[in-house]
From Swiss-Prot:
Protein name (database record): Aspartyl/glutamyl-tRNA(Asn/Gln) amidotransferase subunit C
PANTHER family from the UniProt entry: GLUTAMYL-TRNA(GLN) AMIDOTRANSFERASE SUBUNIT C, MITOCHONDRIAL (PTHR15004:SF0)
UniProt entry keywords in alphabetical sequence: ATP-binding, Ligase, Nucleotide-binding, Protein biosynthesis
Superkingdom field: Bacteria
Stretches assigned to coiled coil: none
GO terms for biological process, alphabetical: glutaminyl-tRNAGln biosynthesis via transamidation; regulation of translational fidelity; translation
Reaction(s) catalysed by this chain's protein: L-glutamyl-tRNA(Gln) + L-glutamine + ATP + H2O = L-glutaminyl-tRNA(Gln) + L-glutamate + ADP + phosphate + H(+); L-aspartyl-tRNA(Asn) + L-glutamine + ATP + H2O = L-asparaginyl-tRNA(Asn) + L-glutamate + ADP + phosphate + 2 H(+)
Function noted in UniProt: Allows the formation of correctly charged Asn-tRNA(Asn) or Gln-tRNA(Gln) through the transamidation of misacylated Asp-tRNA(Asn) or Glu-tRNA(Gln) in organisms which lack either or both of asparaginyl-tRNA or glutaminyl-tRNA synthetases. The reaction takes place in the presence of glutamine and ATP through an activated phospho-Asp-tRNA(Asn) or phospho-Glu-tRNA(Gln).
Known EC number: 6.3.5.-
């Protein structure tokens, strides 16, 4: 797969990044290099490799679920300029 100048401009537009005409060719080269590397990764045979979520084995510690309020409401809103019943008060922005 190859990225052309029009695709670079479209990606920049979607990412809301201003890209000058002089910046398009270097970005095009970089994106093509990245895609070439990804294609190389796709060619690697991983049929005998077991999927994993971490490089190091980890056992998840489980605990009993307990519903609580956390006990931190007052600490959380302590520095807020306006609060009511441990909730933040903010100015109305939509009528």
């Amino acid at each position: 797969m190859s990225v052309d100048a029009q695709t670079v401009r479209r990606i920049a537009h979607l990412a809301r990044i201003a890209v000058s005409d002089a910046e398009v060719p270097p970005l095009q080269d970089e994106l093509n290099a990245i895609l070439a590397f990804v294609e190389q990764l796709g060619a690697v045979d991983v049929s005998g490799v077991e999927p994993m979520t971490s490089v190091t084995p980890m056992a998840m510690k489980q605990r009993e679920d307990a519903v609580t309020d956390g006990g931190y409401a007052r600490d959380i809103v302590f520095n807020a300029p306006l609060t009511e019943d441990n909730y933040f008060l903010v100015p109305k922005v939509v009528e």
